[in-house]
Amino acid sequence: MTILVVDRYYMLMNLLFALTCLLLNLTHCFSPKKFNISAATTSDSDWSIAGSTWYGNPTGYGSDGGACGYGNAVAQPPFSKMVSAGGPSLFKSGKGCGACYQVKCTSKSACSKNPVTVVITDECPGCVKESVHFDLSGTAFGAMAISGQDSQLRNVGELQILYKKVECNYIGKTVTFQVDKGSNANSFAVLVAYVNGDGEIGRIELKQALDSDKWLSMSQSWGAVWKLDVSSPLRAPLSLRVTSLESGKTVVASNVIPANWQPGAIYKSNVNF
């Protein structure tokens, strides 16, 4: 008799539960496995925490090119002053030059909470308070603010931000090579810029004019500058093969350095990642 009463009690409770779900249109009452816990987390779940400061002119581009070697190009499109010096974990002894990151601030009233994209163009060797630190240009730091409150945000000076690495996408740009002003036929160095995708360079190789010539590995000189010293004069035109640091993808800029190349000249390829 007791078992019968209990069974009827549970049948009644199940019926009431089903009716409640129908009335409230709670379809997940019947399929709890469809509930995705990730959907209940914040949109910041794929972001990481970093420290940030800014340097240089309040509306400037940090320093003149900095430790990557880009020179005054950082003030012009496509960089457009939206650049940053990186602490050791971002600069990576120069291998981090050209990497693109989205950064945003959410902790201050002047923060827009909207991400902006910056490129690593300089080094901040003393930025070691946090494991990851962006020393942004004044322009980039202010770009994280609500419109009209960039000065207010810069006055904070030091700020905790959120960041994530993103692919670089220099619209309309191809990989560009600037021959170092000190280069000659036996000691050739080149600055590499506007690399899409990873942005970071893992390897540069050079091939001389003849089809039979082999690819020669260049070494990183400093920042985004790579060099090759040879005993016999290089025979131009020269082709350059660029391998990205993270993905390992490769592009070849065939005959990008012409036979009559000049130190300091800029040569644009017709390739990019």
From Swiss-Prot:
Annotated membrane topology: Peripheral membrane protein
InterPro entries for the chain: Expan_Lol_pI, Expansin/allergen_DPBB_dom, Expansin_CBD, Expansin_CBD_sf, LolPI, RlpA-like_DPBB, RlpA-like_sf
Disulfide bonds: 68-97, 100-168, 105-111
Organism: Arabidopsis thaliana
CDD domains in UniProt: DPBB_EXPB_N (cd22275)
Full protein name: Putative expansin-B2
Span of the signal peptide: 1-29
Keywords: Cell wall, Cell wall biogenesis/degradation, Disulfide bond, Glycoprotein, Membrane, Secreted, Signal
PROSITE patterns: EXPANSIN_CBD, EXPANSIN_EG45
Gene Ontology process terms (BP): plant-type cell wall loosening; sexual reproduction; unidimensional cell growth
Main location: secreted
